């Protein structure tokens, strides 16, 4: 891979690797809670503390593929820097959601809502990139330069 290609995706790759580490952290919390309450075997049911950790992890795992698709689509089709920043914000919000879910369930609600908004922002970036492609193909007008100018200032 040449240096220019790597430069166009390096931030997205970093955010993806950070998200993998975060998933490992969540899985470790589930494993630790399971061993604390169930001994050496892993079971999906148990005390309320385990149920909360397991459910929070499962909710994060369910949204993970959507996050990855939106992150990479927005970064490749529109602009890498704001997509990577939004991805980092999403990971921060997901951490707050996970920790909030372990306490009172109302503490996880702001993280959930803000996470949905970040996914929507990444979706809008992806749509802008697709729209730009068709504007170039049909009208010869490239709005990506305007987008990159705004995002780099």
Curated annotation (Swiss-Prot):
Per the record, what is one GO cellular component?
Answer: nuclear envelope
Task: List the Lumenal topological domains.
Answer: 1-8, 78-80, 129-153
Q: Where in the cell is it found?
A: Nucleus membrane; Endoplasmic reticulum membrane
Among InterPro entries, the record links this protein to: 5_LipOase_AP, FLAP/GST2/LTC4S_CS, MAPEG, MAPEG-like_dom_sf, Membr-assoc_MAPEG
What Pfam families does the record point to? MAPEG
Which parts of the chain does the record assign to the membrane side Cytoplasmic?
31-52, 103-107
Transmembrane spans: 9-30, 53-77, 81-102, 116-128
Asked if Oxidoreductase is a keyword of the record, the answer is no
**Keywords recorded for this protein, A-Z:** Endoplasmic reticulum, Leukotriene biosynthesis, Membrane, Nucleus, Transmembrane, Transmembrane helix
> What does the record's free text say on domains?
The C-terminal part after residue 140 is mostly disordered.
Q: Which family does it belong to?
A: Belongs to the MAPEG family.
Oligomer and partners: Homotrimer. Interacts with LTC4S and ALOX5.
Function, as annotated: Required for leukotriene biosynthesis by ALOX5 (5-lipoxygenase). Anchors ALOX5 to the membrane. Binds arachidonic acid, and could play an essential role in the transfer of arachidonic acid to ALOX5. Binds to MK-886, a compound that blocks the biosynthesis of leukotrienes.
What name is this protein filed under? Answer: Arachidonate 5-lipoxygenase-activating protein
């Amino acid at each position: 891979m040449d240096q220019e290609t790597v430069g166009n995706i390096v931030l997205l790759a970093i955010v993806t690797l950070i998200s993998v580490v975060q998933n490992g952290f969540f899985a470790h919390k589930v494993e630790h809670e399971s061993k604390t309450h169930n001994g050496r075997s892993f079971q999906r049911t148990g005390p309320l503390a385990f149920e909360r950790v397991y459910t929070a992890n499962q909710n994060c795992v369910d949204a993970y593929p959507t996050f990855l698709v939106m992150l990479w689509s927005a970064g490749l089709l529109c602009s890498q820097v704001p997509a990577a920043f939004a991805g980092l914000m999403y990971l921060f919000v997901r951490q707050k959601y996970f920790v909030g879910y372990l306490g009172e369930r109302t503490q996880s609600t702001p993280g959930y809502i803000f996470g949905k908004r970040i996914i929507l922002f990444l979706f809008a970036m992806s749509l802008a990139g697709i729209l730009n492609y068709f504007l170039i193909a049909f009208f010869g007008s490239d709005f990506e330069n305007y987008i990159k100018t705004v995002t780099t200032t």
